[in-house]
A protein has these predicted regions:
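Nuclease catalytic cores that cleave nucleic-acid phosphodiester bonds
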Residues: 13, 19-22, 29-35, 40-149
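Acidic, polar low-complexity linker/tail segments
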Residues: 1-18
């Protein structure tokens, strides 16, 4: 997701190839609005934006989000349906997000800098796509190359 959608993505789409996978740090996205409560709408908006741009979102969250989300019944339905993947209780979802991103060579939508995991995942910063949700619209950061410290 480092660049805007271009000819390569259009070619893959026309050939029926699966869209590129992007991991969504669902807990981070849900809590990107004001207040302590997570908002399921933020997750939906980010996923819709990614699909609109030709990507397939995979939402990963920590188990605590189920106690912090505003639309609990709908959230549980999405977890049960596999739309949202929840890390096991008592584990660190960040580890799973970073591990999957490395294994799948995927980008991560998150405003978390994962500084506490920098030693184990030195490539994490180059995988990040920062975002903002403003008045129901999602803006994704566009980068043309890796970040430099």
């Amino acid at each position: 997701m480092a660049t805007s959608r271009g000819p390569e993505q259009a070619r893959r789409k026309s050939e029926g190839a699966a869209p590129p996978l992007v991991l969504v740090d669902g807990s981070n996205v849900a809590h990107s609005s004001e207040g302590d409560q997570g908002h399921l709408a933020n997750i939906r908006l980010v996923c819709d934006k990614l699909r609109e741009e030709g990507y397939e979102p995979l939402v990963l969250v920590d188990a605590a989000l189920r106690h912090q989300i505003d639309e609990r019944a709908e959230y549980e339905r999405m977890v049960d349906a596999g739309i949202i993947r929840q890390a096991p209780a008592g584990t660190d979802a960040d580890y799973f997000i970073l591990s999957f991103a490395r294994e799948l060579d995927a980008s991560i939508v998150s405003n978390d800098r994962f500084r506490d995991r920098q030693k184990a995942f030195p490539d994490a910063a180059n995988r990040l796509i920062r975002y903002m949700v403003v008045k129901g619209e999602v803006v994704l950061e566009r980068r043309t190359g890796p970040r430099h410290p």
